[in-house]
Amino acid sequence: MYKRQKEYSTIINKNELDKWKRKITEKGYVAIDTETDSLNAIQANLIGFSLATGINEACYIPIKHDNADKQIHIDDAIHFLKSINEDPSILKIFHNKKYDALVLDKYNIKVNSYDDTMLISYSLGSGGTRHSLDFLAKKYMSHSAISFKEIAGSGKSQKSFNEISINEASIYAAEDADITFRLWKILRPRLMGEKISSVYETIERPLAKVIMDMEKNGVCVDEKILKELSIKFENNIKRIEKECFVIVGNEFNLGSPKQIGEILFDKLKIKGGKKTPSGAWSTDAETLNFLASVSYTHLRANETRHD
């Protein structure tokens, strides 16, 4: 259960920033969340960042807020971030590290030694849940995190993060770092307990770096081969659909989780199904993979999935 017992700090002078650096070095870990002016990491400018070294131990460091009387100088902020992120003895904890690392890379900051709570969540249940920070805070802590709309508004009048007051930004950003740290404490031990560490350590985490480099540098593709593969995959899906229709006895939408659930568990009476909170049959990847050895129809249905 999430409970904030004290107010978060806003760091606006270098002495306080230095104190946080010493604290982080002593503990050997820190949750970090960057705040920017764009969802596109390649285009984003760093407006500030938040840190957490424990539950309720979080702060926000403003850098480039408009009309702010006092905030940390960009040079001091970059020096701090570089020294922390490039120190392999300090574990950095992110939620969607790929985004933060792309932002930091623009300032020649590389990230060494890190965990990513979004990837940990994905490793624990790739098809069974969403993996946003807000969703996981609600799921594991019964906490409704402050939304961006609450501090920035929405629609055409929505403010960019640099236009938001430091006071409002501080509460929002520091909470994100605090939640990230709490999630890490909850989810990291489960990797070992559920024997999924190797999936995270050898597949998901390394792959994120590859995808980051692809987003940053682009990739070369053979357009002709790509088109041939697209046609091949499309034909395979159509063939599998026809097989399923023959087995079931009627056509249905293989892209509809609701219809697949009804076919598998209501019509074919396959055992082992589970329902979502809304009362519909669950047909996430975890459920379908579990049932693969039971139902040929299910196995073929799963092969048409694009996620």
Predicted segments — roles?
Residues 31, 90-97:
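Acidic beta-strand-to-loop metal/phosphate-binding motif
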Residues 98-107, 122-124, 264-265:
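Short active-site loop/helix that positions an aromatic residue
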Residues 3-65, 85, 112, 128, ...:
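Conserved "right-hand" nucleotidyltransferase catalytic core of DNA-directed polymerases
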Residues 13-17, 73-78, 97:
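Amphipathic coiled-coil/heptad-repeat helices and related helical stalk/stem segments
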Residues 100-103, 132-136:
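Alpha-helical scaffold elements adjacent to nucleotide-binding pockets in ATP/GTP-utilizing enzyme cores
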Residues 110-125:
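Conserved beta-strand -> loop -> alpha-helix junction used to position metal-binding or nucleic-acid-contacting
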Residues 54-92:
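Nucleic-acid-processing active sites and adjacent nucleic-acid-binding tracks
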